[in-house]
A protein has these predicted regions:
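Accessory "access/gating" subregions that flank catalytic or transport cores
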Residues: 118-158, 305, 311, 319, ...
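Gly-rich Lys/Arg/Thr-decorated short loops/hinges at beta-loop-alpha junctions or inter-strand turns
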Residues: 105-115, 166-178, 271-276, 319-324
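Histidine-anchored nucleotide/phosphate-binding helix
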Residues: 185-199
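Short amphipathic, charge-patterned alpha-helical segments
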Residues: 192-194, 333-350
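Flexible inter-domain linker/hinge segments
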Residues: 74-134, 277, 281-299, 307
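Short acidic, glycine/serine/threonine-rich loops at helix termini
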Residues: 19-23, 46-51, 143-151, 175-178, ...
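Ferredoxin-type iron-sulfur electron-transfer modules in oxidoreductases and energy-metabolism complexes
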Residues: 2-7, 21-37, 46, 53-71, ...
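Hydrophobic alpha-helical positions that pack around
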Residues: 111, 213, 217-334, 346
Length: 509
């Protein structure tokens, strides 16, 4: 009797594809194997990762196929589920990661898919809202606003037309959880949006995806078509962004969906009251909405609320990136420390050099030194430390990093990405670049814009000292933090001032 072909599971996640997964899959198919393309386990340093009967091999190349099949490969990592990186996690949002085919409805249903929506539709909208509120779920996009309160506001708002909008404009450096979820488990996001629609009375949903995610866009469109009868009468459409970082801000995003320039709106009114096309709108990010199906499953809200610490409830998919040995996605309850994340789980730097800084929360997050790695990963602790959790991105830098240059980059990034509507962000970021350059050069460069301004007759004639420039930088940071219309200008001071505080030696003498 002819033996059945070996079934090989290989991710079709964008990162795996970039690492050569298609070539590895083709080599296994040529060797007579049945190849299944599944979602990513999130162990990015091992991609392309090959799974055969639960055993993992990686990073694999086409040349490794023969050794893997005959059992002599040196790239075996044992059972994937038992690997310390996976076994130590508390996966709820990413419970299906590595285990299912992304656009297989059969796989989704076999892993409790649609259970949350089925239960939600057997409940009243008020009961669903109470369940989400009781779970303690907060927005995973950075603001950390309680999801239940936002939904309740939309539900209570007058009007017959309401919308659910998913912010999938994942523009922060070092973040990839949204992309992984959309590419690996799109039905879960769709289910979460359908539950939100039932709770607030919305009939239409939009997923706003950045144009740099073509694989995610294709997976979402395929999944939406397959899920149409499951979520009806609710409808979902994908809208593609044009690359503006500021469109990750909810009101800029709404303008973009409406076909307008991606520009921040003044608040009030809040989008929950006057959002898309002037109608009450729920705007949540991918991870927030993807957490909903579990919460609405039987007993899910109570269990979800039991995880985490104080007001930071549930789990957070943390993304380990930058100069780190074991980069990838690690989902765990709030409260874990940076030391655990970077050193125990991440394995330290990929370069082998000492860790100098970690930036948490994307390009607008504060730089945290090793002396503060004891901080628990939760919203309140980071707020007290003048830092941000943001979208859960953790980017590692070794001791070769120039923190003065990183501070300058924060201002330059803000200047390049500003929508231009408010003065503190538009002008402050440009002045910030000039000021950092002046401080780092010891005031020896050409006169900056401030010095070039017309001077009052009674202005002091002495040039600005380093102390003057540092005070001016602090004043500028305060103005941007409290005067900007959105977080782009408002959060730029976090990386700048944290770099100056902890590494003054990188700013010159």
């Amino acid at each position: 009797m002819t033996p059945s072909p070996t079934t090989v599971r290989i991710s079709d996640d964008a990162l795996a594809l970039a690492c050569g997964a298609d070539g590895v899959a083709a080599a296994f198919a040529a060797a007579g194997c049945t190849v299944e393309r599944v979602s990513s386990w999130g162990m990015h340093w091992l991609e392309p990762l090959v799974e055969i009967d639960g055993l993992g091999f990686g990073p694999a190349t086409p040349a490794d196929v023969t050794a893997i099949l005959d059992g002599t490969s040196s790239k075996s990592i044992g059972r994937i589920a038992d690997h310390p990186f996976i076994a130590g996690q508390q996966r709820l949002t990413f419970a299906r990661a590595g285990r299912t085919r992304p656009t297989s409805l059969a796989d989704y249903i076999a892993t409790a898919g649609w259970a949350g929506l089925t239960r939600a539709r057997a409940m009243t909208a008020a009961e669903v809202l109470a369940e989400v509120t009781a779970s303690g779920l907060r927005g995973r996009g950075g603001a950390g606003f309680p999801a239940g309160i936002k939904w309740q506001t939309v539900a209570n708002a007058p009007g017959t037309r309401k919308y659910v909008v998913c912010n999938a404009d994942e523009g922060d450096s070092g973040t990839f959880a949204d992309r992984m979820l959309m590419e690996g488990d799109p039905f879960q996001l769709i289910e979460g949006m359908a539950i939100a629609a039932h709770a607030v009375g919305a009939g239409q949903g939009y997923i706003y995806v950045r144009s740099e995610y073509p694989h995610a866009i294709a997976k979402l469109n395929a999944a939406i078509a397959l899920a149409a009868e499951h979520i009806a009468p609710f409808r979902i459409e994908v809208r593609i962004g044009a690359g503006a970082y500021v469109c990750g801000e909810e009101t800029s995003l709404l303008n973009s969906i409406e076909g307008k320039r991606g520009e921040v709106r003044a608040k009030p009114p809040l989008p929950a009251l006057e959002g898309l096309f002037g109608c009450p709108t729920v705007v949540n990010n991918v991870l927030t909405l993807a957490a909903i199906p579990h919460i609405l499953s039987e007993g899910g809200a109570a269990f979800y609320a039991s995880l985490g610490v104080e007001r930071s409830k549930g789990t957070m998919p943390i993304q380990l990136a930058g100069n780190i040995k074991h980069g990838g996605l690690y989902e765990t309850a709030f409260g874990i420390t940076l030391d655990d994340l970077v050193n125990r789980i991440g394995g330290g730097t990929a370069s082998g050099r000492p860790v100098k800084a970690v930036q948490v929360g994307g390009p607008l997050g504060a730089y945290i030194p090793p002396a503060q790695f004891h901080l628990p990963f939760d919203y309140e602790a980071y707020t007290v430390a003048d830092a941000l959790i943001g979208h859960g991105g953790v980017t590692v830098f070794d001791d070769s990093a120039d923190m003065g240059a990183m501070a300058r980059f924060a201002f330059a990034f803000c200047a390049a990405e500003s929508c231009g509507k408010c003065t503190p962000c538009r002008i402050g970021s440009t002045r910030g670049v000039e000021l950092i350059d002046r401080i780092r050069s010891g005031g020896k460069g050409a006169p900056d814009a401030v010095e070039s301004l017309p001077q009052m007759h009674n202005a002091r004639k002495a040039g600005r000292t380093r102390a003057d420039d540092l005070q001016l930088l602090e004043d500028l940071a305060e103005t941007m933090k409290f005067g900007s219309l959105c977080a782009l200008g408002g959060f730029t001071p976090y990386p700048v001032m944290s770099a100056l505080k902890h590494w003054p030696e990188d700013f010159g003498e």
